[in-house]
């Protein structure tokens, strides 16, 4: 067969092998799962933290297992599901966008997959699960010269939040709760200056653009 035919056959064989391996091994949540969900503009989210967790969990990058990162130091709890979008990475493109929007220099991505908060009506108390989420906006957060965006999304088909398409449709109190959590969850009671700052709240269009930048960074 011609070279193009052999290449197509090898590509098909590789896809078949990957499909077979999923029957025996769990896919790595960062690298082994597609970012996009079945509906356009919706994304898979791997949940690392719920509003019920007094312990911070995160994915071990080497193994893909969920691990205990640390107990939450203080009493504040994340008001939403919290996790990341697979096959994303906050690198050069994400950092450049943050620098452009803030007019600052020397901003770089934080070297992690893009973070995402998912609003739900029903309580979900399990970590290490996948949900489909629709981004509606985000918080531009900077942590020690690192772009650490927090995408805000709603659970797909959620009865209370699923119809929302813009962060500006949310009650302002919910946005304030998210801002307060991220500004204070690392603060001790004696500290007054947050180690992070939130410079902007942005809408769905920019959230989707930042996700695309994080996908570009992942594939570099």
Describe each PLM feature range.
Residues 1-220:
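Hydrophobic N-terminal alpha-helices or hydrophobic patches in metabolic proteins across all domains
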């Amino acid at each position: 067969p011609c070279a193009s035919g052999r290449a197509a056959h090898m590509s098909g064989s590789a896809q078949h092998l990957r499909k077979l391996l999923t029957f025996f091994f769990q896919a790595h949540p960062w690298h082994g799962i597609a970012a996009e969900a079945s509906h356009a503009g919706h994304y898979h989210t791997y949940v690392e933290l719920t509003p019920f967790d007094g312990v911070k969990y995160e994915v071990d990058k080497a193994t893909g297992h969920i691990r205990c990162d640390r107990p939450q130091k203080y009493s504040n709890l994340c008001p939403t599901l919290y996790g990341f979008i697979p096959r994303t990475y906050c690198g050069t493109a994400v950092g450049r966008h943050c620098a452009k929007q803030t007019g600052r220099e020397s901003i770089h991505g934080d070297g992690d997959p893009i973070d995402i908060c998912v609003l739900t009506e029903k309580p979900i108390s399990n970590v290490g699960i996948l949900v489909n989420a629709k981004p509606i906006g985000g918080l531009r957060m900077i942590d020690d010269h690192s772009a650490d965006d927090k995408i805000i999304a709603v659970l797909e088909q959620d009865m209370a939040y699923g119809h929302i398409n813009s962060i500006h449709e949310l009650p302002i109190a919910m946005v304030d709760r998210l801002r307060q959590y991220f500004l204070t969850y690392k603060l001790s009671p004696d500290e007054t200056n947050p180690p992070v700052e939130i410079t902007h709240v942005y809408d769905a269009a920019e959230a989707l653009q930042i996700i695309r930048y994080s996908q570009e960074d992942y594939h570099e």
